[in-house]
């Protein structure tokens, strides 16, 4: 850890004893439309650089934007799901600034007239309580291009010798969701920040408007934070930690920034209004001075008509909303018969939708929970990715469960099959065959292994014959070891007892 070292940070308990944090979350969500916001270029992740561009998204003279209707519908659906008021009239504005990722030198966004306002999202916390986060606005805008900086130790523009611009992302439809100041969180502030982004991600995924892949940048979180002495009404100076790209990092970034700002204030210093970069080893570093609205010189976009959603159409979209996550969880919890604690663990691990999808593919809820809530969570943590970013699908997990249920795999062998799927070796049945992992059930092969184990352990044989049936476990263990775990343990036990009778 560099920047403010760990030794210089104020202890977290001291921070919350002396200061009240005030947070504001800004989440940018790329919409899963077929084309970009204002042109017909493809909206697809991972294409070769600068192959999904045209005069509109490159800002060439004479090009004119045409609004993507699907993006507007997605924005309205998001607003409705967030309990927002959908305004009867809104319009776009030009946000003017100069930076290499913006070929037009302005971004088409919404400034003082967003499409959705005054909403809220009830967020479940780890202790079973709920925190209501108030939504100030949700507005439409276009994304910027992506810059790759070369020659810099940090991968950022400072110290770079060259910068490469990929404009495939320029013009991709975005929804920015902005909260009102979150006050009174106290010691729970970092948890609430993470829980809010988690709940928002789950909601957007349920709506089907975005794949919300934080690791790919389709959901990006900016965390605004200030501290004020307890009892003071006036807010402190805020910082904005940009582009925090995982749920865990949101919590870590807020906690670090609280401790850093507290250390600055208690030493007599001043917190500067600035953007800050989050580093994966858990600290933030200064970015640039934070601009104000005046710096961007907003004015109405002259090339686009205002958007006036028809009330009947808005109501149609409201009625077509899918089952929302909190309603779905209540239903699932009752159907599966699981406790509040188990449900919270599944939600916090990001496993609930994956478990449900695995059950829909034919697995039992118990087996699906065991895989996604334990073994695969461990694999995700080892890989440093979100659970849904692992290269395995609910259908593949369900296929592994079926192989176990059919007696073709033991639980131990099944873990090896899943590891093979994660390594890209193919479907579960193929991995099982290629690795030779299928359970051995042929009596002749098993009998030979049993006879060998019995011959090597005459003392245990005498114990079994003397009535100590539990001693058969040692022979079963020897057979399992000899067959590398592939023997059918239940059948081996039957053969052992039969041989010793």
Swiss-Prot record:
Its EC number is 6.3.5.-. GO terms for biological process: glutaminyl-tRNAGln biosynthesis via transamidation; translation. InterPro entries: Asn/Gln-tRNA_amidoTrfase_suB/E, Asn/Gln-tRNA_Trfase_suB/E_cat, Asn/Gln_amidotransferase, Asn/Gln_tRNA_amidoTrase-B-like, GatB, GatB_Yqey_C_2, Gln-tRNA_amidoTrfase_suB_CS, Gln_synth/guanido_kin_cat_dom. The keyword Secreted does not apply. It catalyses: L-glutamyl-tRNA(Gln) + L-glutamine + ATP + H2O = L-glutaminyl-tRNA(Gln) + L-glutamate + ADP + phosphate + H(+); L-aspartyl-tRNA(Asn) + L-glutamine + ATP + H2O = L-asparaginyl-tRNA(Asn) + L-glutamate + ADP + phosphate + 2 H(+). GO terms for molecular function: asparaginyl-tRNA synthase (glutamine-hydrolyzing) activity; ATP binding; glutaminyl-tRNA synthase (glutamine-hydrolyzing) activity. It comes from the Bacteria. It is an enzyme of class 6 (ligase). Coiled coil: none annotated. Pfam families: GatB_N (PF02934), GatB_Yqey (PF02637). Gene3D superfamilies: 1.10.10.410. Keywords: ATP-binding, Ligase, Nucleotide-binding, Protein biosynthesis. The keyword Aminoacyl-tRNA synthetase does not apply. Allows the formation of correctly charged Asn-tRNA(Asn) or Gln-tRNA(Gln) through the transamidation of misacylated Asp-tRNA(Asn) or Glu-tRNA(Gln) in organisms which lack either or both of asparaginyl-tRNA or glutaminyl-tRNA synthetases. The reaction takes place in the presence of glutamine and ATP through an activated phospho-Asp-tRNA(Asn) or phospho-Glu-tRNA(Gln). Heterotrimer of A, B and C subunits. Belongs to the GatB/GatE family. GatB subfamily. This is Aspartyl/glutamyl-tRNA(Asn/Gln) amidotransferase subunit B. The gene is gatB.
């Amino acid at each position: 850890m560099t920047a403010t070292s760990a030794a210089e940070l104020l202890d977290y308990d001291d921070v919350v004893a002396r200061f009240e944090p005030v947070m504001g979350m800004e989440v940018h969500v790329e919409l899963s439309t077929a084309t970009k916001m204002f042109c017909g270029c493809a909206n697809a992740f991972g294409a070769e650089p600068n192959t999904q561009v045209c005069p509109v998204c490159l800002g060439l003279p004479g090009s004119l934007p045409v609004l993507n209707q699907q993006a507007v519908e997605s924005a309205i659906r998001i607003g409705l799901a967030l309990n927002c008021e959908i305004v009867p009239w809104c319009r776009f504005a030009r946000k003017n600034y100069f930076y290499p990722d913006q070929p037009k030198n302005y971004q088409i966004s919404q400034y003082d007239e967003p499409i959705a306002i005054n909403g809220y999202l009830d967020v479940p916390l780890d202790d079973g309580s709920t925190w209501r986060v108030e939504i100030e606005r949700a507005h439409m805008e276009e994304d910027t291009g992506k810059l790759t900086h070369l020659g810099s130790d940090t991968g950022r523009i400072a110290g770079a010798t060259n910068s490469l611009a990929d404009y495939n992302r320029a013009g991709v439809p975005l929804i920015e969701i902005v909260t009102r100041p979150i006050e009174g969180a106290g010691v729970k502030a970092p948890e609430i920040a993470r829980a809010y982004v988690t709940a928002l991600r789950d909601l957007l995924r349920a709506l089907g408007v975005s794949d919300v892949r934080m690791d790919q940048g389709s959901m990006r979180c900016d965390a605004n934070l200030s501290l004020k002495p307890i009892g003071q009404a006036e807010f402190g100076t805020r910082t904005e930690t940009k582009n925090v790209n995982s749920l865990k990092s949101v919590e870590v970034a807020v906690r670090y920034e609280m401790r850093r700002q507290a250390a600055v204030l208690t030493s007599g210093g001043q917190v500067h209004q600035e953007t800050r970069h989050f580093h994966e080893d858990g600290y933030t570093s200064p970015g640039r001075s934070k601009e104000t609205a005046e710096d961007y010189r907003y004015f109405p976009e002259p090339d686009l008509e205002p958007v006036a959603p028809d009330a009947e159409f808005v109501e149609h979209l409201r009625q077509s909303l899918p089952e929302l996550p909190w309603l779905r969880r209540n239903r699932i919890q009752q159907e599966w018969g699981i406790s509040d604690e188990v449900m919270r663990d599944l939600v916090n691990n990001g496993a609930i939708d994956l478990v449900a999808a695995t059950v829909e593919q034919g697995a039992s809820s118990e087996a699906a929970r065991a895989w996604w809530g334990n073994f695969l969570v461990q694999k995700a943590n080892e890989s440093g990715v979100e659970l849904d970013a692992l290269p395995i699908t609910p259908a593949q997990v369900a296929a592994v469960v079926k192989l176990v249920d059919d007696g073709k795999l033991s639980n131990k062998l099944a873990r090896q099959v899943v590891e093979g799927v994660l390594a890209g070796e193919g479907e579960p049945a193929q991995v099982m065959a290629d690795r030779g992992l299928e359970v051995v059930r042929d009596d002749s092969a098993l009998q030979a292994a049993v006879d060998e184990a019995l011959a090597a352990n005459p003392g245990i044989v005498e114990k079994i014959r003397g009535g100590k049936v539990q001693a058969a476990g040692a022979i079963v263990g020897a057979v399992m070891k000899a067959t590398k775990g592939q023997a059918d343990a239940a059948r081996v036990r039957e053969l052992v007892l039969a041989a010793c009778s």
